[in-house]
Design a protein with these regions (language model features):
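Conserved SAM-binding strand-loop segment of SAM-dependent methyltransferases
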Residues: 25-40
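A short acidic, Gly/Pro-enriched loop at the edge of an enzyme's catalytic core
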Residues: 39-50
Length: 205
């Protein structure tokens, strides 16, 4: 899509660096990358489409967020959202004890939304289409990541030494292994019918 103008927004400095490196490598010149906290992010540009990939799970005020995104869109613009979700439960990842390791180490302040949660926030944008994808897809993805991690253990340990320090490198290797194992079991549970992936297309009211 060489005639498109693409603006990417992430709160990760490393992610911005990686995207720009890939763009340079592939001679892609129509991508701009902004590092920002979405809670504070504002932009004057208007867009035909906004795509959100696994951001809403890290936000809490969906009413305010969807209102903000509606201001980014042209009158005929649309918003596509990709999130993990539970079939009917919404619950936060909060560090309230020793057992809350996933909240503490990976998803502090995050939330597992229910599949229908976003349907309650249609003040500024309205639902056009909804899709529910089986959790078995992410089950397979988690297992593939685990296998790649195990195959590249020696290389990853060296990276973790730089990131977490010599003493904590192997601890973090095991934490990531447990994370992938947990995700594999979670999303594969009950043939992928409880935890899965939800897609939504919103348009302006």
């Amino acid at each position: 899509y060489t005639n498109s103008q693409i603006t990417a927004v992430s709160n990760s400095i490393d992610q911005r660096k990686y995207i720009l490196e890939r763009c340079t490598k592939n001679n892609i010149k129509n991508v701009k990358v902004i590092t920002a906290d979405m809670n504070d992010f504002e932009i004057q540009d208007k867009f035909d489409n906004v795509i959100s990939i696994e951001m809403f799970e890290h936000m809490r005020n969906y009413k305010k967020l969807l209102s903000k995104i509606s201001n980014f869109l042209n009158e005929k613009g649309s918003l596509f959202i990709h999130i993990f979700s539970h079939e009917f439960l919404t619950y936060p990842f909060e560090n309230e004890g020793d057992g809350d390791w996933m909240a503490r180490e990976f998803f502090s302040g995050g939330m597992m939304p229910s599949h229908n949660l976003l349907l309650y926030f249609q003040d500024d944008l309205k639902i056009d289409q909804v899709w529910r994808l089986s959790g078995t897809h992410y089950e397979k993805t988690s297992l593939a990541w685990l296998n790649e991690m195990d195959k590249n253990k020696r290389y990853i340990i060296e990276i973790f030494k730089e990131t977490y320090g010599e003493k904590n490198a192997r601890i973090w290797f095991q934490r990531w292994r447990i994370f992938y194992l947990s995700c594999e079991q979670l999303f594969g549970y009950n043939n992928g019918t409880e935890w899965g992936v939800s897609h939504y297309r919103f348009v302006k009211n």
